[in-house]
Amino acid sequence: MFLNNEIKNNIFTALCVLFGLAGVGFLLIIICSLIYKGILGLSPGIFTLPTAFGGLANAILGQIILVFMASVFGLFIGSFAGIYISEYSKNKAVKNGLICVIEILLSTPSIIVGVFIYAIFVSTFGSYSGIAGSLALGFIMLCVVAKTFFEALGSVDPKLKEASYALGASKRQVIMSVMMANAKPALITGVILGVARIAGESAPLLFTNANNDFFSFDIFSSLPSLSVSIYEFSLSSDEALRNAAWSGALLLLIMVLGANIITKIIFLKRK
């Protein structure tokens, strides 16, 4: 017996709702568990003591430094790469090749990037450093930013470009004042996704920056890292350190979510 279109549509809708609720449900379970266990592990020492004494104060500062340096590198190189692919690469084979490379790099495990930077940078200079760690994170971010830029710029209505050129605007003016202005929401979202992607990475930092259990602002040596400290604390047999790992994960979530919200608010005000 064949099902009519209405029954098929109802079945399909029910399956979509079911799997959608399942996905959201699992996400809510993870977030609620993180909030519950993270709050239980919070204490004044988390924000005042270094990781050597069971706190995360140095790791929080170190993570901010690493993510900031990586974001500068990733945003600068990634944005220019995306603009070049979208607007300056006229050879179709070269353009498709660059897009393919970016897609492959996006799907590459982050630990591979860490091993690559270790082989090129760390082994050459003979020591772990914050610069090496930020390069690894920045390399991951630039792929996200580059893809976002060439896709966002490619989605701008070609008639806007043609009208701008007809008015005598230069290529730089068209890209900066017309195309990027119209693609701004997508570009901002891409940058936020890039920062969120690297904020919780620990695997590449294990090979490039390692970790530091004390306060340090020397980017030429190992910087403390919140994501690596969470990983190390979670493997500890000390229950207090495992609780601190949950608190660190909660703080990392709040940092990423806070950066996202602040960016959205700034964008809405300017809009």
Question: At which residue positions do the language-model features occur?
Answer:
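Periplasmic/extracellular loop-to-transmembrane helix junction in inner-membrane transport proteins
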Residues: 2-14, 18, 34-72, 232-243
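C-terminal transmembrane helix and the adjacent membrane-cytosol boundary/short C-terminal tail
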Residues: 6-12, 85, 150-154, 158, ...
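Interhelical loop and adjacent transmembrane-helix boundary motif
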Residues: 54, 205-253
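A structural signal for multi-pass alpha-helical bundles of membrane permease subunits
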Residues: 27-39, 117-124
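Alpha-helical transmembrane segments of multi-pass membrane proteins
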Residues: 16, 58-66, 70, 102-106, ...
